[in-house]
């Protein structure tokens, strides 16, 4: 098994605490609402949202994947940090055992935030992880972030 790391940062005009609440803590209900073309639904299969929780994310018809299962590894409210692992379905296919993800939202002096994202791709056997595949996953995540950000800008009273 190989492990391939991919790290990225993206900025947002939304304050860190509000973005953490909307994108991470309430994302299971907000993201299907603001980006139904990307995610149809999110349901907890096991657990209450904390570490160990298993979630099933269902994608809309016409998507390349039907669903993905994720396990919550850490929810750190004080430091706006969230870690989870994709453990079944989706982009894992025949080459990946799991993908471990960490999102840390850091406040910026101008009142916005920086999302620091770390992805660890655990491949099966001696499979290689292609850079364009990692980049495509990052772009999909960024599109979800922008959908949430647009919603929050249009609804200044939401998720405060």
Curated annotation (Swiss-Prot):
It is found in: Cytoplasm. Brassinolide binds at residues 55, 82, 84, 101. The keyword Cytoplasm applies. GO terms for cellular component: cytoplasm; nucleus. This is Major pollen allergen Bet v 1-C. Gene3D superfamilies: 3.30.530.20. Keywords: Allergen, Cytoplasm, Pathogenesis-related protein, Plant defense. May be a general steroid carrier protein. Transmembrane segments: none annotated. Belongs to the BetVI family. Pfam families: Bet_v_1. PROSITE patterns: PATHOGENESIS_BETVI (PS00451). Signal peptide: none annotated. GO terms for molecular function: abscisic acid binding; protein phosphatase inhibitor activity; signaling receptor activity. InterPro entries: Bet_v_I/MLP, Bet_v_I_allergen, Plant_def-hormone_signal, START-like_dom_sf. Its main location: cytoplasm. The lineage of its organism: Eukaryota, Viridiplantae, Streptophyta, Embryophyta, Tracheophyta. The gene is BETV1C. It comes from Betula pendula (European white birch). GO terms for biological process: abscisic acid-activated signaling pathway; defense response.
């Amino acid at each position: 098994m190989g492990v391939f790391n991919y790290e990225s940062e993206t900025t947002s005009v939304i304050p860190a605490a509000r973005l953490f609440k909307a994108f991470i803590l309430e994302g299971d209900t907000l993201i299907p609402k603001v980006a139904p073309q990307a995610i149809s639904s999110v349901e907890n299969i096991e657990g209450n949202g904390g570490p160990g929780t298993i979630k099933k994310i269902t994608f809309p018809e016409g998507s390349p994947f039907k669903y993905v299962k994720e396990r919550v590894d850490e929810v750190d409210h004080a430091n706006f940090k969230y870690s989870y692992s994709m453990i079944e379905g989706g982009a894992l296919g025949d080459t990946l055992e799991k993908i471990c993800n960490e999102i840390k939202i850091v406040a910026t002096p101008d009142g916005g935030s920086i999302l620091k994202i770390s992805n660890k791709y655990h491949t099966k056997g001696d499979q290689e992880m292609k850079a364009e595949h990692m980049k495509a996953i990052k772009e999909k995540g960024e599109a979800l972030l922008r959908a949430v950000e647009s919603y929050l800008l249009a609804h200044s009273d939401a998720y405060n």
